[in-house]
């Protein structure tokens, strides 16, 4: 039981971060848009003034059966999603009947794990959500090129270099075939090693 409690505490950051990730289409980020959106504002001048254009980090196709996946740049100190640890996990027992009605009435000790933290959004530019879109070479290349072309205010190139694809578990082997094999159907696979693959049950839908 204590091992399970410890495991649950260790998984708390993943649970919170990925839960927030799945809410990104309906949760605002620092620029006033939903974190995943098709119209993030970018301004002509570096001070945030001048003509406004928009950029995207959301692709929505028409294939309702295609699982959602994400392409991410994790290289930089700032991340697309952030976990702030406030209190490290620690076992917290209740032994004293003077302080616990349950211990007093039932003569049973209680054990738990206490931890505190919070998940939040970082830079939307570092992650792209792809939904209702098949995981294919062509679709991945489009997203990667979109991310690499992102600019900040004043037209500054952001040098986004995606290095990870985050997939639900039912896309794990398809993603590994796309990024971990030298050939596909007898043809050189130009996407080999382009992205690392991370499959997580926390984003299964």
What is the predicted function of each stretch?
Residues 13-55, 59:
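Glycine-rich, mobile lid/loop segments that gate access to catalytic sites or pores
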Residues 7, 30, 191-193:
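A glycine-rich, acidic short-motif signal
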Residues 1-26, 103-116, 165:
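Long, contiguous amphipathic alpha-helices that act as assembly "spine/axial" helices in icosahedral shell
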Residues 39-205:
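Sequence/fold signature of self-assembling virion shell proteins
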């Amino acid at each position: 039981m204590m091992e399970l409690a410890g495991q649950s505490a260790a998984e708390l950051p993943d649970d919170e971060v990925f839960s927030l990730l799945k809410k990104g289409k309906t949760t605002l980020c620092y620029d006033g848009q939903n974190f995943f959106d098709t119209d993030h504002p970018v301004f002509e001048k570096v001070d945030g003034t001048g003509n406004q254009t928009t950029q995207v980090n959301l692709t929505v196709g028409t294939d309702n059966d295609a699982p959602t996946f994400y392409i991410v740049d994790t290289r930089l100190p700032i991340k697309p999603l952030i976990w702030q640890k406030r209190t490290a996990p620690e076992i917290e027992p209740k032994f004293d009947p003077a302080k616990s009605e349950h211990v007093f009435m039932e003569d049973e000790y209680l054990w738990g794990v206490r931890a505190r933290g919070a998940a939040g959004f970082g830079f939307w530019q570092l992650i792209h959500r792809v939904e209702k879109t098949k995981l294919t070479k062509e679709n991945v290349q489009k997203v990667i090129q979109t991310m690499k072309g992102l600019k900040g205010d004043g037209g500054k190139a952001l040098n986004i270099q995606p290095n990870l694809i985050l997939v639900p578990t039912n896309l794990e082997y398809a993603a590994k075939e796309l990024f971990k094999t030298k050939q596909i159907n007898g043809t050189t696979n130009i996407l080999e090693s382009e992205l690392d693959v991370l499959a997580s049950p926390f984003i299964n839908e």
